Every structure is written in structure tokens, then in C-alpha cells.
Amino acid sequence: MLPLIKQEDIKPEPDFTIQYRNKIIDTAGCIVISDSEEEQGEEVETRGATASSPSTGSGTPRVTSPTHPLSQMNHPPLPDPLGRPDEDSSSSSSSCSSASDSESESEEMKCSSGGGASVTSSHHGRGGFGGAASSSLLSCGHQSSGGASTGPRKKKSKRISELDNEKVRNIMKDKNTPFCTPNVQTRRGRVKIDEVSRMFRNTNRSLEYKNLPFTIPSMHQVLDEAIKACKTMQVNNKGIQIIYTRNHEVKSEVDAVRCRLGTMCNLALSTPFLMEHTMPVTHPPKVAQRTADACNEGVKAAWSLKELHTHQLCPRSSDYRNMIIHAATPVDLLGALNLCLPLMQKFPKQVMVRIFSTNQGGFMLPIYETATKAYAVGQFEQPTETPPEDLDTLSLAIEAAIQDLRNKSQ
């Protein structure tokens, strides 16, 4: 309820009129209530849905409802603190709304470009009940109660190394390792023992070979070595190595075998890779004697042995390819070997297959251990199912016994 006001406290204003539904109302019994704080230009935050509601598509607040009877009253213009000329209520309200729209758009642009900063803007207008000015608080981005808002966390980019650039000579060049140039004439053809240093000049070319430059074992030797390993029922320390030249025909045949190997079970196949070679050197007898003595003394002496002999020439890679096949069981080792040995028979100088040994480090992945144990145990277990041949023999014996019983009964 409004407090009672004495008649002498009411001061009439001669230029004050109230218009309601296009009718002028007598102001003799009307009281105008105004907020002194809003007249002084201070910001007042409107609260509640009845006081303000954002308009669709813009950030301008609406103070009063147009259906309210007091919203259509004309009140006397209040003095502008900035000294601007007065305008009628309709023009001022329209200009205020348009200005607030433009300001809200500009504030949104600033917020989007500023990374979620909070912006406060106040709009003053003389329309509404008692000429009260309206103010609104615009905020964009995420605000936190504890302080300034933080932007999204940036994901760090991972550095992935390229396999093509992991050659030893490329790494040495990146480390600014100086390379010496051999004092020999560079030419094509076979290399003599006293001119072997010319093979290790600073160049990006590989050592090219039409045929493999080492002794190739026979197929019988490779198969015999594989059978000896399979008799132990454990082939986790054995593997197949394939070495072949870069001839197009040879590569096509090897790729066809690789496709068939990819369909087999219990195999670990490597991608074809190159070998890099360093400068050969003959150690003097003193170095050989110190190494032999350290090995005879035991592990501690061998660990303490420091015999590092270096060179300053550029390593060179050979152009023939290498591939390693690791099998889990003897079944898979012999199956892979049966696919690889025909390559040696077809290309006796360009393809070599051999069996190599490793320590008891296990398989490439632990998923093959179950298959290995099952193979070793399976040789000593009795078959649970009767073979089909035994079933046929048993059925024939039953039929013969039935026929004998019939003959005796007659």
C-alpha cells in the first residue's frame, strides 16, 4: 500500500498531462512516482520475468508490457544529464531500441573475438512507467563464479617420426657429424680390399647388387635346420629370414608370397627393410686377446670391457631387402617355409631363405603363448573323437554279427 500523502505535499505541474486510449485524463487526482536514482543516470539491474524479458533475435530488454494501462501514459520529459535535446516518447523509444540492437550486435562481435569476455551495457530510455530508465546486463561466453573465464584447452600435437628418415646416415647428418672423404678414385665395378673405403663416401646412393653378394645355403640345409627346431616342439627362438634383390620380377613374386603368408595363422611378419653398413676394420691381436680374456673371466669382466672403435666415414645401405617371419608353432613354421622355399628354387641367386636363432625372449606378442602350449600338450593327449574310418569298420562288424545271428536262427 502507498503511504498517505498530505494534500499540501502535492505540487501541481501545469504542463503535465496524461493520455490514456487517446483520451486526456484530468491530473487532479493523480500522483506521479519517480525513482530518484534512475533520474540521476545510475544503472539498475532489472530482475524477474515481469520486469524485463529479452526480445527474439536481439539482446534488448523490454521493461513494461504494452497491455499495461500505465505503459501508454505520457509523462513529462526528464532532464538529460548529457544536455541532449528532448524528443517525444515514441521517437526516443524507437531510437533506443534501434541503438540497443546495434550495441548488442557490436557487443556480441566483441565477445566472440575477445575469447568469451563479459561485457556490461546499459540502455536508458524515457518510455515506460514514470519515465523510468531501463538497464540490462549483457554477457557472452562462459562466466565462472571464481574469476575470469578460461578458454577451451588446446590439444597438443603429437610428433610422429617418419620411417623413411630414420636411416643412420640421416640421423648422423642431423647431428652435424663430420664425414671424411676417402682418398680413392670413385668408379663402378667390384671393390678391392685395399680400396674398400671408397664404398663409404658421403652419398645418398645405396650399394647396388644384381645378385646377392654372399653365399646362399641350399634348400636341403634350410629344411633340415627347420626340422631340427620343430622336433623340440618349441620354435619361439627360431625364425625365417628372407633376403631378396630389388629386381621387379623378384619383388612381384615375393609380394605374392607375402599375401599368402598374411592369410596364415600364428605368424608375425615384418615389413621389408634395408641394412646399413659401416666401415670394416681389422682389429690388432692385442684387442682380440683382451676381449677373449674378458669373456673367459665372466660376465662382470665382459661388462667392464670398453673396446669401441669408431670411424669418420659415411655409412652406406645395400639395396637388397630383408624380411623376418616368426612362427608360433612348428605347424606354422613348416607351413611358412613351404611357401618361401620355392622362391629360392625359382631365383637361386636373387632370393635366399635361412633359419636364424634368437634367445628365449618369447614371441613378438604374448597372444601366441596359448597356441604354443596347446601344441606341446596335444601330442600326448588321446583323441576325444573317433575317426571316421573306425566308425565305418565298426558299422560293418555290427552288420556282420547281425547276419550271423539270422543264419543261426534259421
From Swiss-Prot:
A zinc finger (unnamed) spans 257-283. Residues 47-67, 90-101, 132-147 have a biased composition (Low complexity). Keywords: Activator, DNA-binding, Early protein, G0/G1 host cell cycle checkpoint dysregulation by virus, G1/S host cell cycle checkpoint dysregulation by virus, Host-virus interaction, Metal-binding, Modulation of host cell cycle by virus, Transcription, Transcription regulation, Zinc, Zinc-finger. The keyword Glycoprotein does not apply. One of its GO terms (molecular function) is zinc ion binding. The keyword Ribosomal protein does not apply. It comes from the Viruses. One of its GO terms (biological process) is regulation of DNA-templated transcription. Residues 36-166 are annotated as: Disordered. Activates the E1.7 promoter. This activation is augmented by the IE1 protein. It down-regulates the transcription of genes under the control of the major IE promoter. This is 45 kDa immediate-early protein 2. It comes from Human cytomegalovirus (strain Towne) (HHV-5).
